[in-house]
Structures are given as structure tokens and as C-alpha cells.
Amino acid sequence: MCGIAGFVNLNSEPPQEQILRNMLIPMICRGPDGEGVRISGPAALGHRRLAVIDLLSGAQPMCNEDGSVWITFNGEIFNYRELRTRLLRKGHRFRTESDTEVLVHLYEEYGTEMFAHLSGFYAFAIYNVSSGKLLLARDCAGVKPLFYFQTPEVFAFASTIPALRRHPAFPHELNRQALWDFLSLQYIPQGTAYRKVRRLEPGSFLELNLNGSSAAVRRFWKPETLHENKLQISYRDACAELEKRVRQAVAERLIADVPLGVFLSGGVDSAIVAGLAAEMTDSPLHCYSIAFREKTYDERESAAENAAWARQFARHGLIHRIQEVDPCDISILEKRIAEYGQPFADASLIPTSQLCAFARSEVTVALGGDGADEMFRGYERYMAMRYLEKSDFLPAALRKILTGTICSLLPDHGGERGSLARARRFFRGIGASGAERYLGIVSHTGESLKRRFCGSGFEGMRPTLEQFDTEEHPFGKAGDVPLFDLRTYLPCDILAKADTASMSASLELRSPFLDRRVMEFALSLPENFKEQNGHRKRILTDTFARYLPPGLARRRKRGFGVPLADWFRGEWKNLLLERLPQGEGEKSGMFSKTGIEQLIAEHQAGCDRSYALFSALVLEMFLDSIKP
């Protein structure tokens, strides 16, 4: 994995190499093994390299034989050897053994039809000198990020927003609607923190015609088509096919010319990956886990149980290491927010960053279990949405009365977290529908609470739910929720966190469950194969039961939680008082000093406001990081 950046001047000015090199500076941690730049006519392509495959000859930007096609590429193509063989038969000539060069020739052969042939994760830019076109592309799941902006004079792109900010034409105006949405969800679900900066969506490509300066974005992967056309297959045959695909995905992700390991939690997904990887590796498998001092959040015992169970499949042994989270190091959070270039308040970014740094001392590549919950209906909200949908036969007026009556019986003094808070969010869903129902379940900070501590800078903001239920992407039924998460939560939260944390440590993170063949098969399965009678991830746990310790499959899922409430009453108490009431958020009008102080006081008095406070703190850190 690497960092890419570049720009195309749309006027007659030749590109300045120093601008490109400046854009690469914030991405040194993404690619510590080398830097490359290429100026070709109006186009400037740059690259920071983390060497994983073909260590000696894979430097970028890279071109074809005659220099008419250039690429800068971030990611891994796992079937590149197969593609290389096929392209050789068609007359293509290669100078390296790298997957990057395969992409160049695949583009020559198939143009924008090339994506159907790829197995892997990627974000890349290809400049075609002959046609005067620039192509940007991002993988189906959105594992690798890619941002861009366009003005009348320039089109620029990069793996990170801080890299884009180094371009003199960067449009700095903030997207306040995106920041408003962030305060509810803890991530930005659509767009970016900047009004004129775009994020290339997963499974999409952008083609810019330099002759006409027109850019068009198209989707090459449409998961809703698979979701709507379910396979006619027996459960037994589906289990066999799933095992074959996941095994292949794990085997491909074990290919590397550097040391690799596995991230192991106390859950099902990573236990499956660890068991399969242990079975396939030719050396001792290194597994890494995170632990907390706070027992409620600590998974070290269940992670150790998973490691012990996986050890029986290891042909060459298994080494398990555990890292305990240090809550005192707030600098980790500030660094990650600055590197990401946007506010991001999924608190598990902190332990994930510490885990990546811990693992990087021994390995360069790590496998994880991201994506299984979205593919196989692992989240509680999927069941909650199904149960709530059963109330839709009642008249809307009656449902609203029921909601009000039930919620009035549930005390509200406990704050945003805990079982009572979850119950309130669930029962409010009886009186709602579609996106409003979904957001009521997943939003940690509701509209009314936000308005209590936000200032005039957020006046006129639309409710977050209006951003979701659109004509292009209607929300639909409860069965569509995983598709919705594929567009928003997975790429914008889970994978953004994984990319930011791993790249900060120069570590490549791979997830077999995000293999395109696994995803497409999972999406096309009947829903009762994935969830039945409260058994979530049914087909996954049944298929790989031998790799799971007894009882794990039915154990209640524990999210990757962080003890924020305790930290805000302990190690981070003074941090809130020092940073929030008179910080950049208050100066910009985004926060109300009185509202913030009241929020802090409520939390210290026992009403859990940790989600709202953490989102506010992160937004403050972001605003502080972009001060002139």
C-alpha cells in the first residue's frame, strides 16, 4: 500500500514539480520506502511507496513500453499473476514482476472495462498521453481512499485530504452540512469536510477529458443488482461455495515478500481468518490483540481463547501478542485526525492505531475481519430494523402514540449509552420509517441534543436523515440496510479507520471478507441464510464452525468499544475544559460556550454524554489542525 497524488493543469501552464513533491510530504508514513514523480505534458503524477511485493522493481509512477500510459497506484491486485499470463498471450511485454505494471497493460487491453477482471483493493490514477484522458478508480468496497477537486485551472487528486491541501488551488470552504451530519454519526457519510472536495465512491471510476476539461463519474460495481437477484441454491451448496471463496481470499492475502500477521479479537470474523491463515502459512503465524484496563471492554481472555483454538490448525505454530491501550496518550488521536484531514470520532481509532503500531514492530502486512458484519448481517441493527418493520401494519398515528407512551416510561437521565438508551432508540423507531428509523438506531447524538450545544454556525442545517433517503438511493425496506451500510458506514467509518490507523504505522491491512468474489456471493444469498431466528452470520458460523471455539458463534457480539465515559471523568476530564468552551469551534460559531459547559457538567454528574463530547472534541481538534 502507498500514497498517491497528482494534478492536471487545465490551462496552458506547465505543472510545477515542487507542488507535486509538496503534496507527497504528508503521505510519507503511507509510503516510507520511496518517492517517485512524473511530469507528462499537463499531468503530474506522484507516489509514495510501501514495498510489499516485487521489492526491487516496483517503483512508481510506472508506464507501458512506449511511455504513452502512466499510472500511480495504491493497493494490491491479488490475481495479477493470472492476469499477467493472460496479457502475455495477447502480446503484451513486461519489464517487472509487479501488479502495477499489470494494471497498465490491463488498461491498454480493456480500457474502462478492466475492473471486471480485478481481484484486490485499489485506488489509482492512469494518464493516457495519447488520448489526453485521466482515469481515477476505487475498489468495490472502498478499502483505499481517493479524494479530488476541480477548479477552472486545475484538477487534483490524492489519497488524503492533507495531501490535497498542499496544492495552492485547494478550495478551503468548509462543508457545514457534512460537519452537522458528523456530529450525529461520528463520521461524514457523504461528501467531505470541504464543500468543493469530493470523495470518489467505492466501485466507481472518474474519467477526465483534458481536451474538454469535463469529468464524468460512473459506477462499475452495483451491489444492489446482486441483492435484488437472489441465488437459487441449497444451504449445503451455499456453505461449500462460501468456504471455497473465503479460503481462496485468505490464501491470496497471504502472498507477500515481507512478514505478515493477523489481527485477532474475541469475535467470530477474526477467529475464522486466524484459523485459516494458521492452516496455510509455512512459518509461525503472528497474531495481535488489543486489551483494556476496564474489564467491561477488555477482550483479552476471549482473544486468547481464539488464539489457543487457532493454534491447533497451525502447521508451524502460532504466536499471540496482546497490547494494552494507553488512554493517556491523547496525541495519538490528534495525529490521526490531522493525517485523515477530516473530523472522525469512531473512538476505536485510538486502540486500532496502537494495535497497528504494535504489530508493525514485527510485520508489514496484517489480515483482519473487516466486512463480515456487513456481508453476513452481523449487526444488531439489522435485526432491530426487521422487528420494527413488523409494526408498519399499524396506522402511522397509532405508531406515534405507542412510541411516545413507551419512551415516556423509559428514564432519560442515563444519557446516550447503555441498555436504556438503546431501548429508547429502538422504540422511537416504531413511529418512524426508512432512513429516519435507521438513523434513530445508529445516531449517537440526536438533532435536539446537537442543537443544545451547537451555535449559530450551524443555523439552517437540514436534519441528517434528509441526506440519506434520496431518489437515486431510496432507503427501502429493512433488508436493504446492509446495502446502505456498504455505501456509508463501511467505507466512511470502518475502512477509513482501518486505512488511517494502519497507514500511520506504514502497515498494510488486508481483509478477506472484502474480496469481490466473497462480497458478490454474500450479497446474492437468501437473507435467511445469513440471519434466522436471531442467529446472525448464520452461514458464516456454520461453514467455519470447526475454526470457532465452542459457544463463540452464539455469544453476544461485542463491538470494538472504548471506555470514553470513564476517560472523560478521569484521564481526559481536564482536556474537555481546556479545549472546548473557548476553542476554535466556539470562535467559529459552531459551538455554544454555554451549551458545551452544560454538556460537560451533565456528564460529570453521571448522565453519559460521552459520544456528543467526543464528537465535539474531535471537531475541535480538526478545526485547530487547519488554522492558518
What is the meaning of each model-derived region?
Residues 105-108, 178-185, 484-492, 612-626:
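Short, hydrophobic/amphipathic alpha-helical patches that form generic packing surfaces
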Residues 1-76, 105-224, 247-251, 274-280, ...:
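N-terminal glutamine amidotransferase
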Residues 83-84, 521:
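Short active-site loop/helix that positions an aromatic residue
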Residues 91-98, 169, 173-174, 237, ...:
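Structural motif
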Residues 46-56, 124, 140, 256, ...:
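Short Ser/Thr-interspersed hydrophobic loop/turn segments at strand-loop and sheet-helix junctions
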Residues 7-21, 89, 109, 129-155, ...:
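ATP-dependent adenylate-handling active sites, centered on carboxylate activation for C-N bond formation
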Residues 548-606:
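PAPS-dependent sulfotransferase catalytic core
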